[in-house]
């Protein structure tokens, strides 16, 4: 939330390690910009900066707020064509809203990602004030659409473990949003119910900020 494609680039410090390991990093923006939708910049947790990696169905957002289609059907294929990367070894990870996106997109597009991980993700968006606000705005009262973009609900509906190689989630215990917005325990329970291996690592003293992100 509130971030751009530059936030991770300038604050996370991941480039050095990625260069050492031969990993290409792709940092997409978090929402459309410059669309001129009325009210798009009135709130920090909705509209600009809060795309939530979904395709909106409610007007006036439906035309431009199509982040899932942009990422999965435009940006990733274009990246694979333009750069010498191994498309069979693409992983996805994200922080907070980006963690929500990593988990939901990976489940909504089975087999697309070789690894899936998240840092302090919004893991049960329907239970979070952030998620309720965004889903109401982008989907209206279509609860079925809400459920299709809630990581815990999606996991609970899996007939078999979708990621047999396992999932990795890091979460700071001093995170001010942990109990109200993030709900990692709900996602962990959903994983347990479908026997999805997940490694949920809690870290004392770490909050929701970029010191946490740059550490793990």
Where in the sequence are the language-model features?
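Non-catalytic cap/lid and distal C-terminal segments of serine-dependent acyl enzymes
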Residues: 1-216
